[in-house]
Amino acid sequence: MTTRSIPHLIIGFGKAGKTLAADLAKHGESVILVEQSAAMYGGTCINIGCIPSKLLLVEGEKSARLTDKSAAFQAAMQRREQLTSALRAANYNKLATIPGVEILTGTARFLSPNVVEVLTEDGACQIEAERIYINTGARPATLALEGAEDKRIYDSTGLLQLDSLPARLVIVGGGYISLEFACMYAAFGTEVTILEQGDTFLAREDRDVAEAMLAMLADRGGVKVVLQAETKRFISAEEAVTVVTSQGEYAAEAVLVAIGRRPNVEALHLEAAGVQLTPRGFIQTDEYLRATPNIWAMGDVAGSPQFTYVSLDDYRIVRDQILGEGKRTTKDRLLLPTSVFTTPALSQVGMTETKAAASGRPYEVKRLQTVAIPKAKVLGETHGLLKAIVDTETGLILGATLFCPEAHELINLLKLAMDHQIPAEALRTQIFTHPTIAEALNDLFASN
């Protein structure tokens, strides 16, 4: 077995890993990046996450004008494959052509804090690295229940790659991933049922927001949400698979299990490197994302919020220690905007009304129904509402929840205002173009 020495070893071709590799090489450093699968060059987002799922949401909306939903679905899947293949190749070629970067396709495991064994198709080699960065991501959690081996039971990756449109889809789990897939498949004409084990729908959201989401789901494709539905087992039959729950039985041609994600750490043999895990199984790091004196973890595997843009910010934190002043930490990102790409999108930043009430701070709630926005009427998208929490003493925005068209774009404007302490009054009087969703901020912050 050959042994090689390198200043930097990156395990995982995700957003943080690939960006760090390119940056280090452009500063004259030598880097080896190891990726387990050629099908994952570029990471989760472009291959089995953000990009293909959003494409299918868009294609689903387009299919509303078509009568042959099955053909539209198959065409959408072909476009998904074309797009992800192109992005995967572009990501590989962009990195592989940078002098100083070498990409190995294989599995990596630690032998010691500085030595990693990499097994490729050509055999095994040992890599001794001064600094090692782990960016292996996460994968969908599974259910170890009777009948779960049925091939019609999918995780999110599998449901993005179906060959044919199911007439019925049952989704186990009522979280944000479930909502996106519900909207996606309902748009293509699939009958969708969401099974939520808890007794509260979208427990982290304000009740008026959750109720607005329920109303939208019911209106758009008749998505059904069942609460307190604990999944017990699956029953396989030739024509369908049945999900047996505490609230009854639900048959479908496809079942999605969307109950969270688990870190990809098992194959790494982290104990050999002295790397510790959190109680939830993610890599334990400090505020600089350092797991040991010479090992860093970035992205989902580090327990960071599971968004591509957070993985990118993780890169910035680690990069600052290697190439910068070393001052940037996870504590610097106080405000994190989020978006759920339902139809319309649900986006949030800062405090919700529920959190504001628990904080003890003086506040008022600004509220505007989406139906009051002229551009929403033009688009025919009048579901939802906009909410903002404003400090009554300072006039500063404490948080916002937007459930309306273009919410995923508009939330970034509100985050920017909050970051720079721009008062709500400035948005109330700001001149916006018309007709736009952004101009609704005038009315939102003028509301009582």
What does each model-found stretch correspond to?
Residues 4-6, 122-131, 246-254, 291-292:
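Core beta-strand elements of the Rossmann-like FAD/NAD(P) dinucleotide-binding domain
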Residues 2-6, 44-129, 205-232, 353-355, ...:
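N-terminal Rossmann-like dinucleotide/flavin-binding domain of flavoprotein oxidoreductases
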Residues 9-39, 44, 51, 55-56, ...:
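Flexible, glycine-rich terminal cap/loop adjacent to redox cofactors
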Residues 150-166, 249-325:
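FAD-site-proximal beta/loop scaffold in flavoenzymes
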Residues 42, 82-89, 160-161, 166-170, ...:
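Rossmann-like dinucleotide-binding cores of NAD(P)H-dependent redox enzymes
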Residues 102-105, 109-120, 189-287, 351, ...:
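A Rossmann-like FAD-binding core segment of flavoenzymes
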Residues 6-8, 13-87, 184-204, 409:
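Beta1-alpha1 glycine-rich phosphate/pyrophosphate-binding loop at the start
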Residues 50, 136-191, 195, 225, ...:
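Glycine-rich dinucleotide-binding loop and its adjacent helix/turn
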